């Protein structure tokens, strides 16, 4: 048995009916370990899984953490994914990177606060311009002392219907909706960005499984199983239309936000 920590309403990552792509990845991993995936569902956002579930030993592994996440012990990375620009296919704006002149022409830009997107929006002087629109994506809910998730489905819907000209999102979070819509396109953002202080702002991130910091035996067993599960994992990601980047020899460490 492999006890998997899982959020019950974190589409497209994890859904209680098992349709989340990370639910499928967990099952592929468990099969490669000759175990059965048993999901321990949690009705709060996934950002609380480490604190409220894994650390309390209510489950044993989390799918889809940034490699090197210091709250846990992470496995070898099993894929690498980018932040992307999402536009309508018929958009007249040509936006390929953060230096694209057409960025300033975008009517509304959707993004998630606390991510590389916000850092670069601040650098380019666009954060305040699109601040109110960002908060409209949660219907202006008060974010003080609580976490309010911006729905990736909603963000993609607003780009598709023309409310927004552009979204800057983590590809795994939106690829499903881009694929399903047919009128949207993703552009991988290059991983060569720096902030106002010259510090590097990563836009491509290795993804790993996470276990408790003292659970080295399980981490090692997962590492041994990843090569066996790799073909199945890559097929799941391909079906989701998530861009799969080459894993570097020295994986990038550190969280997205």
Can you describe what each PLM-predicted range is?
Residues 1-71, 146-149, 239-240:
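Extracytoplasmic small-molecule ligand-binding "clamshell" domains
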Residues 2-8, 12, 98-128:
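Short loop->beta-strand "edge-of-pocket" segments that line small-molecule binding or catalytic clefts
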Residues 7-10, 66-69, 80-81, 88-91, ...:
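Solvent-exposed coil/turn segments that connect beta secondary-structure elements
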Residues 7-8, 80-92, 139-141, 179-226, ...:
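Periplasmic-binding protein-like
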Residues 20-33, 89-93, 98-117, 196-244:
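Extended ligand-binding regions for polar small-molecule ligands
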Residues 26-36, 40, 80, 117-149, ...:
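Ligand-binding cleft/hinge of the Venus flytrap
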Residues 30-38, 55, 59, 90, ...:
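Sec-exported extracytoplasmic/periplasmic mature domains
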Residues 48-49, 55, 63-73, 123, ...:
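A ligand-binding cleft/hinge motif common to bilobed small-molecule-binding domains
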